[in-house]
Curated annotation (Swiss-Prot):
Residues 20-56, 82-192, 292-334, 387-484, 603-648, 662-711, 746-765 are annotated as: Disordered. GO terms for biological process: definitive hemopoiesis; endonucleolytic cleavage in ITS1 to separate SSU-rRNA from 5.8S rRNA and LSU-rRNA from tricistronic rRNA transcript (SSU-rRNA, 5.8S rRNA, LSU-rRNA); ribosome biogenesis. Coiled coil: none annotated. This is Protein KRI1 homolog. Residues 85-100 have a biased composition (Polar residues).
């Protein structure tokens, strides 16, 4: 068959026919597009001329308005210019951000119409794309290499620099140019400027903003008039610009202007438009965006937010006032502390005079520092301890030269001279000095015959020196010097006037306590607050220092938790814990269970020593049977009888548990079987160890058992909570009947003892 051929002429004619048909159909539907474009362009030009604004012109307007509101003297100057010349020319060069150009969106039909009108309905085919790719490849092959391009760029840069230098020399050219701001940056600056006028942001103070500061303060005044506030909102929000009403309800003619085609796309678009129209019409009286949650108040009084920081300023004033009051209180407490310190120093001086110790242990440093209870106790113990009060109390002081006082006077009962006696002694001394005549019995009497008494009397200093020299001489020379002096040093000290003891006066310790109480950490509600120390009962928790140091942390926590040692409790609770831990410390078995590491070391050493004296298995079984028989015999005895020595450890455990559980109910007597078994195993192991230590254990003697002993054991009952239970029944539940029996026995004894004590108390009353 021959190849198929296409008639190209017929194809071209048919294609032209289809294009004309499509063009006519579009014209019938949309009308003449050229006329509409011309009319629309004229309308848009008129709208743009109305909307276009200049931001510099707005700033000049705000500046002049601020000067007018302020009544600045610049207004009355003849040469004052409120609008710069640049604003007139800048409006044509730069388009403001606020101007909105009405640009019609392009749809698919518009694009097809454009292709039909401009290109005759021809689209770019694959052949043309291949041709473009081949052309690009040819251009790339003819282009220079990378090195050649770099050289060309360097040469062009050199030429440009040389030309720019020549132009700079002439004064016309400029190598560096000012960077032009983008439209986004300009819009952002304009928005910041408007927000600054609204009072919502702060900007750097520039010369341009100084003149407009008054206008900003005027508009942000909360007491602004309604008319002025309306003018402010109208100017700042640019209410004079007409905005497109997006939610405008279209008319019926606008909706039905386009004919509905049979195609699915146009039918769907018509349905969407119909639904939108119905929705807008039905909800025309409701608020827009009613389904969204508003993050701002619905009814805004003014669009410009005014700062209302009255509460903040009030809080700051209150805070400052409280800080000042706190400082005044601290200053007053410091002054009080200084006065108290001066009072204590006066007391110290008096103590130095009375005690004769001029170097006491207290200094200014001790009083200036912070209060330390341990240091305070050490100082008080050092100065006023047992040594201070016990000093010179072992023997009564004796003076050799005071015979006249020792014979007839008891100085221990001396209270002090009264006022009349002191005046009499003073007068007597004064008269004696006036009518003094030398006597041979006086110690200062001169035996020289050539001595002239009319000469000047000896000075007091010389007399003191002579007395000191006489004291230095030995006792053998004393009788040769004549009679002793009348008054000794002790008598002079006693004769001095001293303050009588006042029981109402505070002690030195009380003064120090008051001084240290003036210290404080903080002042809360005009009250100085300080940390108070608290006395706590000393408690070792039933452990020695070696046990505490050698035991592990887990073992110590099992004995007594760390939380319990740090609890804040009353003195009564502390004493109860002290008593309980003392009882707990006596239980050696409990300690062995808790402190395993301590007792394992001792047991290991003893086992190494006693490895020779081990007992065989058969003998151990015999000893166990003998012990069991002894236990069964002792249980048949009366209830008042004491438990056998083999069960002393078990009884001690019961005592400890009963002492801690005195308030436990009688019904809570059931003990788990596992605990019973562990207690019995510990007792048996202990007995085995005692037996193993003996090299040749003696076989225990068999005691005469009563007939029917086992029957008696089985038939014996245990009373618990007012009921009787057989031993077999308790054993069936996994309980130890012996343990329960002794527990009830000790409870009865305790009750009887309490009754006897009550009766004794009543009898004493």
């Amino acid at each position: 068959m021959s190849d198929l051929k296409i008639n190209k002429k017929f194809a071209e004619k048919y294609e032209k026919y289809r294009q004309k048909e499509e063009l006519q159909r579009l014209k019938d539907r949309y009308g003449d597009q050229e006329e509409e474009n011309s009319s629309n362009s004229s309308e848009s030009d008129s709208d743009d001329s109305e909307v276009e604004l200049d931001p510099k012109l707005d700033r000049d307007f705000y500046r002049t308005l601020s000067l007018l509101k302020k009544k600045d003297p610049k207004i009355y100057q003849k040469d004052a210019k409120f609008y710069t010349e640049e604003t007139s020319g800048s409006g044509s060069d730069e388009q403001p951000s606020t101007s909105k150009q009405s640009e019609k969106p392009m749809f698919l039909k518009d694009y097809e119409r454009k292709v039909i009108l401009e290109r005759g309905g021809k689209y770019e085919d694959d052949d043309s794309a291949d041709e473009e790719i081949s052309a690009k490849m040819q251009e790339r092959a003819a282009s220079p290499t990378y090195i050649q391009e770099q050289k060309e760029i360097q040469e062009s840069l050199r030429k440009f620099v040389q030309d720019s230098d020549d132009e700079d020399s002439d004064g016309d050219g400029q190598f560096l140019t000012r960077r032009t701001k983008t439209q986004e940056e300009k819009d952002k600056e304009e928005a910041d400027y408007v927000e600054w006028l609204k009072g919502q942001t702060e900007l750097d103070e520039k010369e341009e903003l100084k003149d407009m500061k008054y206008l900003r303060d005027y508009w942000n005044n909360p007491q602004l008039d309604e008319k002025e506030s309306f003018l402010r909102d109208f100017m700042l929000n640019k209410g004079y610009m007409e905005e497109e009403d997006e939610e405008r309800i279209p008319t019926y003619n606008e909706l039905m202007q386009d004919d509905v085609d049979d195609s699915e796309d146009e039918g769907e678009s018509f349905l969407h438009k119909q639904e939108d129209f119905e929705r807008h019409y039905n909800f025309r009286f409701e608020e827009p965006d009613a389904g969204k949650v508003k993050t701002y108040p619905r009814n805004i009084a003014t669009s410009v937010r005014s700062k209302d920081d009255r509460r903040k300023r009030k809080r700051e004033e209150v805070k400052e006032r409280k800080e000042k009051e706190k400082e005044q209180k601290q200053q007053q407490l410091k002054e009080l502390k200084n006065l108290k310190r001066a009072e204590i120093m006066d007391k110290l001086k008096k103590l130095q005079e009375l005690t004769g110790n001029e170097q006491l242990a207290f200094n200014d440093v001790d009083l200036d520092g912070d209060f330390d209870p341990q240091q305070h106790d050490q100082l008080m113990q050092k100065v006023f301890g047992d040594e201070y009060y016990e000093e010179n109390e072992e023997e009564k002081p004796q003076f050799e030269g005071d015979e006249e006082f020792e014979e007839n006077w008891n100085w221990d009962t001396w209270v002090g001279k009264q006022q009349n006696e002191e005046e009499y002694d003073h007068k007597e001394d004064y008269t004696a000095e006036e009518h003094y005549q030398p006597n041979c019995d006086d110690p200062d009497f001169i035996m020289d015959a050539d001595y002239d008494p009319s000469q000047q009397a000896v000075s007091k200093k010389k007399r003191k020196k002579e007395r000191e020299e006489k004291k230095k001489k030995s006792k053998e020379d004393v009788p040769l010097m004549g009679k002793k002096r009348k008054k000794s040093h002790f008598a002079e000290i006693i004769s001095k006037s001293k303050p009588v003891f006042d029981p109402n006066e505070k002690s030195f310790e009380q003064y120090l306590d008051e001084y240290y109480k003036l210290d404080f950490e903080d002042i809360i509600d005009d009250l100085p607050c300080r940390f108070r120390y608290r006395e706590v009962v000393a408690n070792d928790f039933g452990l020695s220092t070696d046990e505490i140091l050698n035991a592990g942390d887990k073992e110590l926590n099992r004995w007594c938790s760390l939380r319990k040692t740090c609890m804040y409790r009353s003195e009564r609770e502390e004493l109860c814990d002290l008593k309980n831990f003392q009882i707990k410390a006596r239980n050696v078995k409990k300690k062995q269970q808790v402190f395993v590491s301590l007792f394992n070391e001792n047991d290991g050493q003893e086992e190494q020593k006693d490895t020779k004296g081990k007992v065989g298995k058969k003998r151990r079984d015999r000893l166990k049977k003998a012990e069991l028989t002894e236990k069964s015999d002792t249980t048949v005895t009366e209830e008042t009888a004491e438990p056998p020595p083999a069960e002393q450890a078990d009884v001690q455990d019961l005592k400890a548990t009963i002492a801690n559980d005195e308030e436990e109910d009688d019904e809570e007597f059931l003990v788990p079987k596992k605990k019973m078994k562990t207690a019995e195993t510990v007792v048996t192991k202990r007995k085995e160890a005692d037996v193993e230590r003996t090299e040749k254990p003696k076989r225990p003697r068999k005691k005469m058992r009563r007939s029917g002993g086992r029957r008696l054991l089985k038939s014996m009952t245990v009373k618990m909570a007012g009921r009787e239970f057989s031993r077999q029944r308790l054993q069936a539940y996994g309980l130890n009947p012996k343990r329960l029996h002794f527990r009830e026995l000790y409870r009865q004894k305790r009750k009887e003892r309490e009754k006897q004590e009550k009766q004794q108390k009543k009898s004493k009353q």
